[in-house]
């Protein structure tokens, strides 16, 4: 049907006086964004979602429906996929983008301001902790284990048969 390849052509025309020249901001060239052939998935994150009618509904050679049924079902599939996608994106895209932005901003903030300083602090303190742990081991644990070992080494068992 070709509906999945059609792109919406949206253009915004403004007079030069509509721009506020007093703000000191440089605006991007509108011609740069007027390209309707823009690739919205440059890293191919969702290449697995490019399904056609033949990928979902397939009739073997031995069982074919009427040609009109096949054509109408193909048209209905493409139209419903196109319309439902547009409908769902109108109502879900903006709220989900907002929530994803909040989530990623929160995770970035936690990573930058809490997790990485904590990790760096631990890595910075570890040599001191290692030195203290070695001293504690040499002063307390090693003599304790040595004395327990000597105590158990003097234990002997003798078996007698009576």
Curated annotation (Swiss-Prot):
GO terms for cellular component: caveola; cytoplasmic vesicle; focal adhesion; Golgi membrane; nucleus; perinuclear region of cytoplasm; plasma membrane raft; sarcolemma. The modification Phosphotyrosine is found at residues 19, 27. It is found in: Nucleus; Cytoplasm; Golgi apparatus membrane; Cell membrane. The keyword Cytoplasm applies. Monomer or homodimer. Interacts with CAV1; the interaction forms a stable heterooligomeric complex that is required for targeting to lipid rafts and for caveolae formation. Tyrosine phosphorylated forms do not form heterooligomers with the Tyr-19-phosphorylated form existing as a monomer or dimer, and the Tyr-27-form as a monomer only. Interacts (tyrosine phosphorylated form) with the SH2 domain-containing proteins, RASA1, NCK1 and SRC. Interacts (tyrosine phosphorylated form) with INSR, the interaction (Tyr-27-phosphorylated form) is increased on insulin stimulation. Keywords: Cell membrane, Cytoplasm, Golgi apparatus, Membrane, Nucleus, Phosphoprotein. It comes from Plecturocebus moloch. This is Caveolin-2. Phosphorylated on serine and tyrosine residues. CAV1 promotes phosphorylation on Ser-23 which then targets the complex to the plasma membrane, lipid rafts and caveolae. Phosphorylation on Ser-36 appears to modulate mitosis in endothelial cells. Phosphorylation on both Tyr-19 and Tyr-27 is required for insulin-induced 'Ser-727' phosphorylation of STAT3 and its activation. Phosphorylation on Tyr-19 is required for insulin-induced phosphorylation of MAPK1 and DNA binding of STAT3. Tyrosine phosphorylation is induced by both EGF and insulin (By. similarity). Coiled coil: none annotated. GO terms for molecular function: D1 dopamine receptor binding; molecular adaptor activity; protein kinase binding. Belongs to the caveolin family. May act as a scaffolding protein within caveolar membranes. Interacts directly with G-protein alpha subunits and can functionally regulate their activity. Acts as an accessory protein in conjunction with CAV1 in targeting to lipid rafts and driving caveolae formation. The Ser-36 phosphorylated form has a role in modulating mitosis in endothelial cells. Positive regulator of cellular mitogenesis of the MAPK signaling pathway. Required for the insulin-stimulated nuclear translocation and activation of MAPK1 and STAT3, and the subsequent regulation of cell cycle progression. Residues 87-107 dip into the membrane without crossing it. The modification Phosphoserine is found at residues 20, 23, 36. Residues 1-86, 108-162 are cytoplasmic. It is a peripheral membrane protein. GO terms for biological process: caveola assembly; endoplasmic reticulum organization; insulin receptor signaling pathway; mitochondrion organization; negative regulation of endothelial cell proliferation; positive regulation of dopamine receptor signaling pathway; regulation of cytosolic calcium ion concentration; skeletal muscle fiber development.
